[in-house]
Amino acid sequence: VLSEADKSNVKGIWSKACCHLEDYGAETLERLFFVYPQTKIYFPHFDLTHNSAQIRGHGKKVFLALHDAVNHIDDLSGALSRLSDLHAHNLRVDPVNFKLLSQCVLVVFGVHHPGALTPEVHASLDKFLCAVSTVLTSKYR
């Protein structure tokens, strides 16, 4: 459960990303595919080269969804219900991949905002991403 301090920390660090959703999203996916190459199997039709239009487009979608989750931090289930259905029933993404993606999101924030990603903010952002992952995998059962 996210505390009020966690919510404040997440909103604060996220405000630094809201103007860079496509860039941060693309960088997150590129890191995901490089560090965890097994995740590429979900994107066989994508051009996975650096800065490709498909990676930028999907990265932006991922970060727009996270942006929406931040804006609805008190109702993550409602905000992410459609995406939960999509990933569980249509895409059938292995739930472990959400944790891998979350790790890459944390790295991107650390790279771009090292001073803002204090240990407390890091912990809050990690808790938030875990909460998002829990919602996205809730319909797998």
UniProtKB/Swiss-Prot annotation:
PROSITE patterns found in the cross-reference section: GLOBIN
Assigned keywords, A-Z: Heme, Iron, Metal-binding, Oxygen transport, Transport
InterPro entries assigned to the protein according to its UniProt record, in alphabetical order: Globin, Globin-like_sf, Globin/Proto, Hemoglobin_a-typ, Hemoglobin_oxygen_transport, Hemoglobin_pi
Residues that hold heme b according to the record: 87
Origin: domain of life: Eukaryota
Gene Ontology terms for molecular function: haptoglobin binding; heme binding; iron ion binding; organic acid binding; oxygen binding; oxygen carrier activity; peroxidase activity
Domain (Globin): residue spans on this chain: 1-141
Family that this chain belongs to: Belongs to the globin family.
Other comments on record: Displays a pronounced Bohr effect despite the lack of the His at position 146 conserved in the beta subunit in most other vertebrates. Shows chloride-dependent sensitivity to organophosphates like ATP and 2,3-diphosphoglycerate (DPG) but not to inositol hexaphosphate (IHP). Binds molecular CO(2), not bicarbonate as reported for other crocodilians.
Known partners and oligomeric status: Heterotetramer of two alpha chains and two beta chains. When oxygenated in vitro, exists virtually only in polymeric form. When deoxygenated, forms tetramers, octamers and larger polymers.
Classification via PANTHER family: HEMOGLOBIN FAMILY MEMBER, HEMOGLOBIN SUBUNIT ALPHA
Name of this chain's protein: Hemoglobin subunit alpha
Source species: Paleosuchus palpebrosus
